[in-house]
Each structure stands twice: as C-alpha cells, then as structure tokens.
Amino acid sequence: MSDMLPLATYSLNVLPYIPTPAIDIEMPVTVRITMAALDPEALDDQKQPSTLRIVKRNPNFDDEEYDDLLNGDYDEDEMASDDEEEEEEEEEEEKPAKKSKKSKGKKKDESEDEEEEEESDSDLDEEDDDDEFEEYVLATLSPKTQYQQTLDLTIAPEEEIQFIVTGSYAISLVGNYIKHPFDTPMGDMDDSEDEDGSDYDDELSDSYYNDQYSDDDAEDSDEHDLTPDEDELAPAGSVEEIEASEEEESEEEEKKSKHKKHDHHHHHDHDHDHDHEHKSKNKKRKQEEEEPKKEHKDKKVKFKKDLEEGPTKKEKAESKKADKTPKRRTLEGGVVIEDRTVGDGPAAKKGDRVGMRYIGKLKNGKVFDKNTSGKPFVFKLGRGEVIKGWDVGVAGMSVGSERRIIIPAPYAYGKQALPGIPANSELTFDVKLVSIK
C-alpha cells in the first residue's frame, strides 16, 4: 500500500467571519490541501484584504474531565455528590424568595458585587477557550497584490480543525481526498495478500516464531549429545555389553588353554604332573587378570552413576527461551507494546520522520491493513498525522526494531467506523522501523 494516494478532488469555500470545519462529518476521510485562492468579488464595500486562519485544538490543553471519561477513570461518588448539589440548587430556586428589609445602599453594593463576579467568570471562560484552541495565520490575499497561495496541509478526520476568513473576500481551498494508511478496505487487501504478503510476513514471523520452534528442536537434540568426558566414561555399549565382551574373552582363553592342554597331554603323557601344575598357574593367572577388569568395570559404572554434572543443555535452552520472551509494557491511554527485536542507532522521538513496515489486525485476528513491500509508510512522529496509538507506541524505537502495538479504541478510531474496521475496535499492529530522518 502506497501512502497518501489521491482519491478525489477536495474543495471548500470559506466565507468571511463564518467558522467552517475542514472535514465534513458525513465523509470522514483524510484531506490534503494544496491551494488557497481568493474570490475577486467583494462581499462588502470596504474591500479589505482577506486573511485565512486555521483554528485547531491545543494538543497540550489538559481537559481532565474529558481524559477521565475517555480512559474510564471517574469517581462515581463525586459524580453523585455533584448531582445532589445541582438538585439542591434547583430546589432553592423554586422556593419563593422572601422579602427582606434592607437599605438601598446594601442592595446597590450587592448588585455591584454580583456584576464583578459575573465579569470575572466570563474572563475565566474566555481564558479557558483561549487555552483550548490555537489560531494560526495561513495567508493574506488581495485582488491588488496576490490572488492565490500554494499550501501543503494534511488533515486527518479525528482532528478538530476549522478555517476562518477575516476581510471582504471569500477564499476557496482546493486539494485532494487521500488514501489514509489505515483506510484500505478488506476486499482490496484480500486480493493483494497473496501477491505481496511474502516479504514482511517472513521477516516478522521467522524472526520471532521460528526462535520458539528452534528452541524446542535444540532441546531434543541436546538430550542425546554427550561431552568428550562422557564419551570416554560411557562408550557406545552399556554395562551389559561390557560384561558380555569380557565373558567372550574368557571363553576364548579357556578354549586356547584346553586346546594346549589336550595337545600337551596327547604328546607328553609322562609330564602329567607338570601339566597339572601349568594348568593351576594358568587358572590363577586368569583370576588375577579378571579381578582388575571387574574392579575397573565397577569403577566405571560407579563413576558414571555418581558423576556430578552442571546445568544441562536443556536447562540452558529453557533459560535462553525465557530471555527471548517479549517484554510487555503499558503506556499512555492503555497502549500496550511488546518489543520483539531491538534495533541499533538513536531512538525515534517527537518530530522525527519515520518509515514503517506494518501489519494491522483486529482483535479476532483478521488483517485489515498492511505495508510489507514497496515504499514504506512515512509520517512525522508526534504531529497527529496518524492515530494517537501510533504516536505513543512507535516512540522510542530505533532502526531495525520490531514491536507489537496493541491500541485500545479511544487511541485508535474510537466510535468511528472505517472500511474493514468496526466502531470501538481494539487494533493490533506488528511494526518494524526501517528509517529515521
């Protein structure tokens, strides 16, 4: 998927002194504005140059009540007490006001105090409004000096942005509706999944999942591997094979001695006593030879049995497998990240232009969007060009890093439904950072 592809022509006519939303609620699609042009027909007799301003919500504005409701952190007792206070105030207002005898001077003082309180409250409200919204000048156009001005503004549907014109002339904005990185319909992606889904799928899955299977294989193979010392202590055969080989050797020696005895008796009958003495010597020598063998055999088996061994390779493989388990962290707004691979170089920070590969899935495992080949998806981190969960989850990654980002609905698209993404959807992204500028 290539990012920022134009879909259709965008146009907006901004009349003087009328705040105009940048994006229609009925068509929540990302827009890119490239030109502002002046309407040469004046709407009043003053014919003053028109100044185009953009008004947007302050990202640093701390609306605690809104954040608490968004994250589910609110005090039920406190809300109940607020409701009770409101009910009491309503009851007091419904009661008939009692007439009190007061001097005219006191009434005048009270009215002045009330006016001062109302003025201070209105001043505070105006300050809050000023803190909540920011206003910036984009261009000043006049039929005498300049009719138009090139722009390059990208506005996402979730941004609260309006345009205001001050002056005598209307200003028209033109550009394109563009393909948002998360706006790919399910049907389009299913068709292309077999064609271009091999590159990054292998990159992500092989680097993480194959490690788990390779660890299991390593355990099986390590169980049958012996060290050189173990090979020396326990050769190919078992204890029974050692005993069988020694018995065969003794039988061969007995056959040889019997054969010699038979020949000697057949040819030298007169040396019978000498032969008997020779036989007893052979028997004694045979016993002396067998005793060291048995001793050596017992030592072998005993030494093998009582051998103290260090940590086995299986235990080492299990410890390595535990070390490879991704570390899970919870960030702002409930965004969860799991680092699969740690890259090299500096970490991405707010304002950096980052290039990403990614695979986006719903909670049920269905893939709704991906960028695994071709041109990477590039955006400016922390500037609101993507959903808030990406600005939070991508921060801190370095080139080559792979990470899983689990984004709750308030930090994704919230109640807004997009093609392939139902409303209030939790989104999961497997991402890889490929460039930082």
UniProtKB/Swiss-Prot annotation:
Region (Disordered): 42-146, 179-328
GO cellular component, one term: nucleolus
PROSITE patterns: FKBP_PPIASE
Catalytic activity reported: [protein]-peptidylproline (omega=180) = [protein]-peptidylproline (omega=0)
EC code: 5.2.1.8
Activity modulation: Inhibited by both FK506 and rapamycin.
Record has rRNA processing as a keyword: no
Main function: PPIases accelerate the folding of proteins. It catalyzes the cis-trans isomerization of proline imidic peptide bonds in oligopeptides.
Name of the protein described by the UniProt record: FK506-binding protein 3
Gene: FPR3
